[in-house]
Every structure is written in structure tokens, then in C-alpha cells.
Amino acid sequence: LSGATMAAGLVAWFGAKGVKRVVERDRPLGYLPDVVIREGDGSGLGYVSGHSAVAATAAVMAMAALPARWRPVPAVVAFLVGIARVVHGVHLPADLVGGWSLGVLIAFAALWLVDRLDRAGTAA
């Protein structure tokens, strides 16, 4: 599952970059000139948050491998990664929702693919 997690994380990162190019929405500085930027220069495209997408992907993949009592931990970490992006002034809340959604979708697709490959290997 670790290899699938790495691959899914890369797909999430590059998927977020692709969505940014299609949507072409600025970061908060483009809409809120008084925003305080705590990281970088606030330039570039904002929707979706790549950090949130990768964090959500990693969280879902980890949740699939963890015992039930530990599953909330990666979800909380992914949530906090997104919140940090808003606090740093580099994303709007909608960017986080988009990133988390993309990440969860990619993780579910990766888990489905891993399951299919495992079943195919068992049947062979």
C-alpha cells in the first residue's frame, strides 16, 4: 500500500496543478489586497490547493491501513494542513475544499485499483 500511496500522492499533486491551469483562479492576494501573506509572495494560481489534495490523499490511504481507533488522526492532520494554507494567506477556503475533494477522489481510485490488482493476482 505504501507504493500506491506514493503514486496517488503524485497524481494528486500533478492533478491539482492541472486543475489550477484549467480554472485559472488567483490566490487570495488577487481578490483581497489587504491579505497578510505569511509564506511566499502570494502569486500564482490558487484553486485547488495542492497541499490539501496531497494531504487528503495520504490521509485516506493511511485510514485504509490503520485500525479503526487511529483513523481520525490522518483526517485531522489533513484538515490542519489545509487550515494552515489559509492562515498563511495563500489559499481561500474554497481552494481547500477543492483540494480535499480531489485528494479523496484520487485516494478512492487508488484503493479501488489496488483492490482490483490484488484480486487479479489472487485469481491468477
Regions found by a protein language model. Give the residues of each.
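Interfacial segments of alpha-helical transmembrane regions
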Residues: L1-G15
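Short secondary-structure boundary micro-motifs
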Residues: G3-T5, L29-Y31, P74-A75
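Membrane-embedded catalytic cores of phosphoryl/pyrophosphoryl-handling enzymes
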Residues: P33-A124
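Transmembrane alpha-helix/helix-exit interface in multi-pass inner-membrane proteins
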Residues: A12-P28
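Short, surface-exposed helix-loop/turn micro-motifs enriched in polar/charged residues
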Residues: S2-G3, K20, R71
